[in-house]
Curated annotation (Swiss-Prot):
Keywords: Transferase. One of its GO terms (molecular function) is glutathione transferase activity. It comes from Anopheles gambiae. Homodimer. Conjugation of reduced glutathione to a wide number of exogenous and endogenous hydrophobic electrophiles. This is Glutathione S-transferase 1, isoform B. It comes from the Eukaryota. It holds the Pfam family GST_C_2. Its EC number is 2.5.1.18.
């Protein structure tokens, strides 16, 4: 199973941890966006959106990290861990989906809105966008009130994996989220629970140079 990825990318790391959780071995294909490797004809044939992560499973190509994560669990997950990772109960699954969409459309989006213009465009820091990150973290802190996992329940889910990858990027970027006590408690507990969290951390370090000159 081929996995086209960039180490510093939180979505790529989330897929990598999901694969480890369901026991799938990935054939890693490092894709350097700075060198335009994602624009090569052979890659565009797989993924016309030319983005990573991209998974190719026996000729079946799929991109968007959360879609890939769900696919891996539904196809390769074992009954013993499936119901925690991506529950079959409609309401429990809906909560996991909601948290995944929260990560994609709110937390990770707001992180990108603040940091990426500074990194890639040399734009000045936007304090309004910075404040919106704090608001998103406050939402996550509320989700975790009285809960061990972001979607509740007795085991980590795909939502925990995705958000853990995102928060690892926050830490590497130098963003201090220690004021969000529930988030901090949860974040510190994840490395002992999520498989390949050590790889998540080491891969995330690849992004550190991009954040060195960004205002926090």
């Amino acid at each position: 199973m081929d996995f086209y990825y960039l180490p510093g990318s939180a979505p790529c790391r989330a897929v990598q941890m999901t694969a480890a959780a369901v026991g799938v071995e990935l054939n890693l294909k490092l894709t350097d966006l700075m060198k335009g490797e994602h624009m090569k004809p052979e890659f565009l044939k797989l993924n016309p959106q030319h983005c990573v992560p991209t998974l190719v499973d026996n000729g079946f190509a799929l991109w968007e990290s959360r879609a890939i994560m769900c696919y891996l669990v539904e196809k390769y997950g074992k009954p013993c861990n499936n119901d925690s990772l991506y529950p079959t109960d409609p309401q429990k699954r809906a909560i996991v989906n909601q948290r995944l969409y929260f990560d994609m459309g709110t937390l990770y989006q707001r992180f990108g809105d603040y940091y990426y213009p500074q990194i890639f465009e040399g734009a000045p820091a936007n304090e309004t966008n910075f404040a919106k990150i704090g608001e998103a973290l406050a939402f996550l802190d509320t989700f975790l009130e009285g809960e061990r996992f972001v979607a509740g329940g007795n085991g980590y889910s795909l939502a925990d994996i995705s958000l853990y990858a995102t928060l690892t990027t926050f830490e590497v970027a130098g963003y201090d989220f220690s004021a969000y006590v529930n988030v901090l408690r949860w974040y510190k507990s994840m490395p002992e629970l999520i498989p390949a969290s050590d790889t998540n951390r080491s891969w995330a370090e690849a992004a550190r140079p991009f954040f060195d000159k960004v205002k926090h």
